Amino acid sequence: MMEQKDRYIRFDWAVKRLLRNKANFGVLEGFLTVLLGEPIRIVEILESEGNQLNETDKFNRVDIKARNSKDEIIIVEVQNTREIYYLERILFGVAKAITEHIELGQLYSEVKKVYSISILYFDIGRGTDYLYHGQNSFVGVHTGDFLEVSTKEKNAIVRKLPAEIFPEYFLIRVNEF
């Protein structure tokens, strides 16, 4: 009799083989739409090592690139093996995605927010949940209040929380399902 673990298709296998076809993007878009709570469209499925510009450039192991209705960037990575400094690597990946999507001479207001979603098939650390969300905010050291940034745009004051600008991270620990 076949073992229970052998009966299911792994998500990483499906992404790399079945869902690579544009006709099947609906499955991935549905997954991302539910996770992020808004409509998501897949832009492309990437070859993980194919986004390296030259041999000295670090590559970003992104498997899926998508966008939301605000044209923000979503990068999805399926990671099978444990890696030392994994959090530093996803930080690098987000930074690279940001810099790849702004041209010299563009205003910083054109920088797109990035969502990093890591589907992990290894134990990254201690915790009881299978889904973790990380986001940046600036909290007053003495008051505990959240900083709201104000900028003047077109004769109007625009207020934004840093969480609306800085990247968001999702870590999905598959082995904890």
Which sequence ranges carry the predicted segments?
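Elongated, amphipathic alpha-helical interaction scaffolds
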Residues: M1-F177
